[in-house]
Regions:
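Glycine-centered short loops/turns at secondary-structure junctions
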Residues: 58, 85, 110, 194, ...
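C-terminal helix-rich "cap/oligomerization" subdomain common to oxidoreductases
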Residues: 37-40, 75, 261-303
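NAD(P)-binding Rossmann-fold cofactor-contacting core
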Residues: 1-14
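Rossmann-fold dehydrogenase core element
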Residues: 76-93, 113-118
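Hydrophobic residues in well-ordered beta-strands that form the structural core
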Residues: 24, 63, 88-90, 199, ...
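Beta-loop-alpha module in the N-terminal Rossmann-like domain of NAD(P)-dependent dehydrogenases
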Residues: 7, 18-80
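Predominantly a Rossmann-like dinucleotide-binding segment in NAD(P)-dependent oxidoreductases
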Residues: 94-171, 175-178, 296
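Contiguous beta-strand/loop segments that form the cofactor/metal-binding neighborhood of enzyme cores
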Residues: 149, 153-229, 256-271
Length: 303
């Protein structure tokens, strides 16, 4: 079943090739006992209320990122899933990219030594084509520039690699876009491990994506040629004290892989690769970044 209160004009053409029942109300899906899980891909500000409704109806939940807009909201959703014995999936598909799976392997095996710095920039100008009143440009549903679009993926990877955060400083700015949209967000995150995570995401410049992790025994860098939906290859470079290794990975359908991993967890075939603590921690960091941008880049402590 598909639910959309305002479906696009070409929805019937799509349904001719991919038949499914269309409803205008989420309640129809929640009351259908045949439905075991619900995927939420709605404006971010609606996530928490809808997620809790899905769990209360006895369904497994897959929610597009960010899970919620606040850390308290994330706690409520994670706790509700845990109490109900349901599997919580989140749309952080970058962990499923072959290059980032290799990065996680290198870090977990100690190939980079102690992680010192994680530095990333993921930017694109897709938002130039959006109408001014699009919710993706709204400070209520999408605060701090591109934080909810791409920044939240980077912080997810940071947390996976370095653990929980201790302090956040962040700034956003508007030099080109007209209000309420913002041109970029840049954040500096101190982790409890002592590592630093720094990232920038611009919403006004052509595509660029680089993710680099530096350790005392080596560094690894991932360069993407295009956004995940474009099917372009990604290049990984690993340098240690013995030399340089470069690997080119062809694109894979990471969105589907994430859905399949969630479905496998629902069926008890495997554990989902995201922990509740990681999902909650990412929203704590997201909330702190938003707070810092709204307070001229002042430090926000995470306890």
């Amino acid at each position: 079943m598909g639910v959309d209160p305002t479906p696009p004009a070409d929805i019937e053409d799509f349904r001719q090739h991919h038949p499914f029942k269309l409803s205008h109300s989420l309640d129809d899906a929640l009351s259908d006992r045949r439905i075991e899980g619900v995927v939420l891909a709605t404006p971010h500000a609606l996530h928490e209320q809808q997620a809790l409704s899905v769990i209360a109806a006895g369904k497994n939940l897959f929610c597009e990122k960010p899970l919620t807009m606040t850390s308290e909201g994330a706690k409520r959703v994670v706790s509700a899933c845990r109490r109900a014995g349901k599997v919580l999936g989140v749309g952080h598909e970058r962990r499923f990219e072959p290059a980032f799976e290799e990065v996680q392997k290198l870090v977990s095996e100690g190939a980079l030594g102690k992680i010192l710095l994680m530095d990333a920039n993921v930017s694109h100008d897709n938002f130039r084509r959006l109408a001014k009143d699009n919710w993706r440009l709204s400070p209520e549903s999408a605060p701090a520039g591109m934080m909810t679009a791409v920044g939240i993926h980077m912080t997810d990877l940071f947390i996976k690699l370095a653990g929980p955060a201790q302090e956040v400083r962040a700034r956003s700015a508007r030099l080109i876009f007209q209000p309420p949209a913002e041109d970029f967000v840049s954040a500096n995150i101190l982790f409890k491990s002592g590592a630093i995570g720094a990232f920038t995401a611009l919403s006004i410049t052509p595509f660029y994506a680089r993710f680099t992790i530096y350790g005392d025994a080596g560094w690894v860098e991932v360069m993407s040629k295009a956004n995940v939906d474009q099917g372009k290859p990604t290049t990984l470079t690993h340098v240690d004290h013995e030399g340089r290794r470069t690997v080119v990975y062809e694109a894979t359908d990471t969105v589907t892989q994430n859905f399949e991993a969630w479905a496998d967890a629902v069926e008890g075939k495997a554990s989902y690769r995201f922990t509740d603590d990681e999902l909650s921690e990412n929203i704590r960091v997201f909330e702190a970044i938003v707070k810092s941008t709204r307070n001229n880049g002042s430090a926000v402590a995470l306890r």
